[in-house]
Design a protein with these regions (language model features):
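Generic beta-sheet signal
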Residues: 196, 300, 316, 451, ...
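C-terminal helicase lobe
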Residues: 370-408, 413-434, 440-666, 740-744, ...
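Elongated, non-catalytic scaffold/linker segments and compositionally distinctive motifs
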Residues: 539-549, 734, 776-783, 787
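Extended interfacial segments that mediate partner engagement and assembly in macromolecular machines
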Residues: 661-719
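N-terminal helicase ATP-binding lobe
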Residues: 1-316, 321-347, 359, 368-376, ...
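Glycoside hydrolase catalytic-domain context in secreted enzymes
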Residues: 714, 736-739, 754-768
């Protein structure tokens, strides 16, 4: 639907007494512009019911008029007589226009881009990224090519991952990670793939998309479960091997004994094949909002792997810091069976505007002004739940009555309701602490406003990343004063003291609830630490005590003092089975205190380093590109910034850089016996073909060729290739030469078929590049080519025989 069509529908709706047959069509569009229009309708309906929503409506009206570049007539309506929103009206009921009317302290260019929904996409070299027949048919022939070469590398790398391996895949937001999940789930017949998703909203979103793409033939083929739903249905479907793809929350796996036991059993009899963890950086995310159940997943996974050593694990996220990678490898890899597919890239939609204030009152006034003038939907990040409540109260005083608060104090039921309303465009101001964000996949957030300084560049970037997920420009503003820097630095003092760490650890270790074995200790975390004021030793702990006790165990695990072999949740408390790696922590003496002191010092150093990196960057605003800070955190990303206080335009290090950030060589494919038979035990085979290559491609892919390389301008009818080989990769020569620069055996191994036609120059280059490679090479040509640079026929240079296609066909038919 075009902008003109949308504005015509909206204008008609207002003129026809709030009714329009075409409004239903608009509601089904599911586009950024249709969302803007529907928010206008929703807030007007609110206003008509209660005049207290007049400010909310006029804010939505400003966003609508500026985004569409239009004007509107609303019968019998009179705008507020202020300059809150830059609205101008020709008398009551007259035509309404909007002007930007932006304050001088904001970057007007960035604001305009966000209002106008400017597409922000990096320039890319076009690659020939054909789907293989398996994916083509699995997705019901909806696509013939991958979305991008990044998606192809991610999906094919995942599909080729051997049993028993863990694959970490870094791929940019919006790049199409979901296709990896779908293809893995259906790669092996009668198998189960479990996807661990951080939030219910993201779980439901992924479930709906999977059903839309896959179109399952049985009702239980794709399922999801979270607390409160019918657990019998899921457990029975697992037991009866009916599910192919199951979406779960980490809390379900840790806390629901029936679901966990059914998964462990499914692993034991080989039905449970793949464990996928989405937003995997949260698994080891540290700080005040760490997710205990996410951090305990590796212990449950150990039990699953014990039952099925062939279980594959996949860790997906858009970005990983070096520390996160190290921790994930330590906790999730077995016997060195680890592969990284790194397609890391900084976001191209984010524009940064850092605004320093002189006083608290100036900052407060600016926040109110920014909420009025910046594009919506807007997420306003604050430091604490009290700050969130105070800001909401301030907004209500000036007339905004349709905002929501999402903090660590928000209960689960209310969280679910808020997220549903947020995604359904029922409101457009979200006031949040760091508890909000991950997995809330609202695509059209136009502004992320930070009113505090986060604890690290990583946390800050993750919060900024809630915006612009539709690929359109997003403004990331931060307004701060010097007091905010002091508040950020005060976080360093929140690290547990040696006394408290020691007190919590030895209170748990020496509790009568703890069971000690020869090599293991079963620890009950519901123990009150003996340093607690007025506490009786070993009395029941409250929720805060349990959380801090878990924190200490996880901290010791991170320091490699112990490993967590199992984790369970019984009667509201976490029970850990741990293996002690450093036996010095079993004794409450000076040695143990020194060890704990060193852990505390390292924890303090890490927190201090993160905070100083961000606060130091604030001092350089305008002199240094803001995004260089992110390159320091995400070390494999190239320099890219869509705009900041130093520059308005795009700043990038390399143009059209190949997206694979490091070689992928953890394993190699083996050549099938049929292909070995065809090439007669040699490394290469030259096949002379008359006419189309397609019949030979079909036969050789059936025989087990792993990769087909075709000219970039060659069209290929995927529907005519009938192999069910899920690992088959089809690429163009541009991609092949990029992959050949380094050892990428995950993609270039086994047997590779090169379609060369009559191109002798290309043949000469291929012979040079593939010389002495470990994979088998089969060359398809129309005639024995003259290799000018070598002054020989191609058949003389190939380390193998030269055969006519009809001879090969006889051996294959």
């Amino acid at each position: 639907m075009t902008d003109n069509q949308i504005t015509e529908i909206i204008q008609q709706w207002f003129l026809d007494d709030n009714s329009c047959e075409k409004l239903f069509v608009l509601q089904t569009q599911n586009t950024t512009k249709s969302f803007i229009a529907m928010r206008l309708i929703n807030t007007y309906v609110l206003y008509k019911k209660d005049a207290k929503y007049k400010m909310d409506f006029e804010c939505a009206l400003r966003n609508y008029l500026l985004s569409f570049g239009t004007s509107i007539v609303i019968p019998d309506y009179k705008i507020i007589d202020t300059d809150y929103f830059g609205l101008i009206q020709n008398g009551t009921g007259g035509r309404i226009n909007a002007h930007y009317s932006l304050p001088l302290y904001v970057n007007s260019q960035f604001v305009r881009k966000a209002f106008e929904c400017v597409k922000c996409k990096r320039e890319e070299i076009p690659y020939s990224c054909f789907l293989n027949p398996y994916i083509y048919h699995l997705t019901n022939k909806q696509f013939k090519t991958f979305k991008s070469v990044e998606q192809q590398l991610a999906v094919m790398g995942a599909l080729r991952t051997p049993n028993g391996y863990t694959a970490l895949v870094a791929m940019s937001t919006g790049g199409g990670k979901s296709l990896m999940t779908y293809t893995l789930a259906y790669q092996v017949c009668n198998s189960l793939t479990v996807v661990v998703v951080p939030t219910i909203s993201l779980m439901l979103d992924q479930y709906r998309n999977a059903e839309r793409i896959i179109k399952p033939t049985s009702p239980n083929e794709i399922m999801y479960y979270y607390s409160g739903r019918n657990v019998d249905e899921v457990v029975n479907a697992i037991t009866q091997k009916q599910i192919r793809l199951l979406f779960l929350s980490p809390e379900t796996i840790i806390k629901n004994r029936r679901v966990r036991d059914s998964l462990l059993s499914a692993a034991g009899y080989g039905y449970f094949k793949n464990l996928v963890i989405d937003e995997a950086h949260i698994v080891v995310e540290w700080g005040s909002s760490f997710r205990m159940d996410f951090q305990c997943l590796d212990a449950i996974r150990k039990q699953m792997v014990m039952n099925n050593p062939e279980l594959r694990t996949f860790l997906f996220s858009a970005t990983f810091s070096k520390k996160t990678i190290d921790d994930l490898r330590n906790f999730y890899s077995d016997k060195g069976h680890w592969v990284e597919i790194r397609l890391d890239a900084l976001r191209s939609e984010l524009h940064f505007d850092i605004i320093r204030g002189r006083s608290r009152s100036e900052k407060s006034n600016r926040i109110m002004e920014l909420v009025c003038k910046l594009p919506h939907p807007i997420i306003i990040y604050v430091n604490t739940p009290d700050d969130a409540a105070a800001l909401q109260s301030q907004l209500e005083k000036i007339g905004f009555n349709n905002s929501r608060c999402f903090t660590g104090r928000t209960g689960n039921a209310k969280r679910k309701n808020i997220i549903e309303e947020w995604i359904d465009n029922k409101f457009d101001i979200m006031i949040a602490t760091c508890a909000f964000g991950v997995g809330v996949d609202k695509p059209d957030v136009r502004t992320v406003l930070h009113t505090y300084i986060p604890s690290s560049p990583n946390q800050y970037y993750q919060e900024c990343g809630r915006g612009g997920r539709d690929g359109l420009a997003c403004l990331n503003a931060m307004t701060y004063i010097s007091d905010d820097i002091d508040a950020a630095k005060s976080l360093m003092q929140k690290v547990l003291t040696v006394e408290k760490m020691s007190g919590r650890w030895f209170s748990m270790l020496n509790s009568d609830k703890t069971y000690k074995r020869i090599n293991e200790v079963i620890i009950d975390t519901s123990v009150k630490p003996n340093y607690s004021e007025n506490a009786v030793f070993y009395t029941e702990a409250n929720n805060a005590d349990i959380a801090w006790n878990v924190y200490v165990i996880l901290l010791f695990r991170r320091a490699d003092l112990l490993s967590i072999e199992n984790a369970s949740y019984v009667d509201g408390k976490y029970i850990f089975t741990v293996k002690i790696k450093n036996r010095s922590i079993l004794f409450n003496d000076e040695t143990a205190k020194q060890i704990i002191s060193s852990i505390r010092a390292e924890e303090f150093r890490c927190i201090r380093s993160d905070i100083l990196e961000l606060t130091t960057a604030l001092k350089k605003v305008g002199n240094v590109c803001w995004s260089t800070m992110f390159n320091d955190v995400y070390t494999l990303t190239d320099e890219y910034c869509a705009g900041c206080n130093q520059h308005d335009g795009i700043c990038k290090e390399h143009a059209n850089l190949f997206p694979l950030r490091k070689p992928v060589s953890a394993f190699a494919l083996s050549t099938t016996e049929k292909i070995k038979e065809i090439i007669g035990g040699e490394d290469e085979q030259l096949i002379l073909c008359e006419g189309s290559f397609l019949p030979m491609i079909i036969r050789l892919t059936r025989a087990g060729v792993d990769t087909v390389v075709i000219p970039d301008d060659m069209s290929l009818e995927i529907n005519q290739i009938d192999t069910d080989n899920s690992k088959l990769m089809i690429m163009g020569y541009k991609e092949f030469f990029e992959l050949s620069r380094e050892d990428n055996s995950v993609y270039l191994s086994g047997s590779i078929l090169f379609c060369l036609g009559d191109n002798s120059k290309l043949a000469e280059k291929i012979l040079l590049v593939t010389s002495h490679k470990q994979y088998c090479r089969i060359y398809l040509v129309h005639q024995d080519l003259d290799i000018i640079g070598r002054n020989k026929k191609m058949s003389e240079l190939v380390n193998g025989t030269c055969k006519r296609d009809y001879i090969i066909k006889k051996g294959l038919d």
